[in-house]
Design a protein with these regions (language model features):
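Amphipathic alpha-helical hairpins
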Residues: 1-165
Length: 165
């Protein structure tokens, strides 16, 4: 398999994080449905659609790296698998919508950080196509982070702090 540059490796990571986000939003949607939170389900469906589009755009861009697409997508699969492991550890049978959005807050913060690193690498390398992708994806990831953070706070506000956990 081809050796990857830091830029190519980071592209693989953000691709894998987008793939993992698709699974994470599906899991949190299941938790939101348990508590009949229709507003949350609509938010999660949009986030999931945007994660799918991000993964597709990343995969398409990876195809433009001569002889490197397979290696970039292998990096993506490894990152996706790590995300799936984190999801399985964090959300168990006792989890609720708040737990799900707390997880999404962490995951989205991580995605924002990865996209910002890719942005810096692309700028330094003057990689126009990567910079264009980052310009499209980073604002979406920042919005996802803010939505997850605010939704966590909203759900927490409806909890009785003195109830048993």
């Amino acid at each position: 398999m081809a050796d990857l540059t830091n830029l190519e490796s980071k592209l693989g990571e953000v691709t894998g994080l987008a793939m993992a986000a698709k699974s994470a939003t599906a899991k949190v949607m299941t938790l939101a449905r348990k508590s009949d939170e229709e507003e949350l389900i609509a938010l999660l469906e949009r986030m999931q659609t945007e994660a799918e589009e991000t993964a597709e755009r990343c995969t398409e861009l990876a195809g433009g790296f001569e002889g490197k697409k397979t290696a970039i997508l292998e990096e993506a699969r490894e990152t996706k698998d790590k995300g799936a492991q984190m999801l399985d550890i964090y959300l168990d049978d006792d989890s609720d919508a708040l737990d799900g959005f707390e997880f999404l807050t962490m995951a989205e913060a991580g995605e924002v950080g990865h996209w910002e690193v890719l942005e810096r690498l692309a700028s330094t390398a003057n990689a126009a196509e990567v910079k264009e992708l980052v310009g499209w994806a980073l604002p979406i990831q920042q919005r996802h982070f803010e939505e997850a953070r605010k939704t966590s706070a909203k759900l927490a506000a409806s909890e009785d702090p003195n109830d048993e956990s």
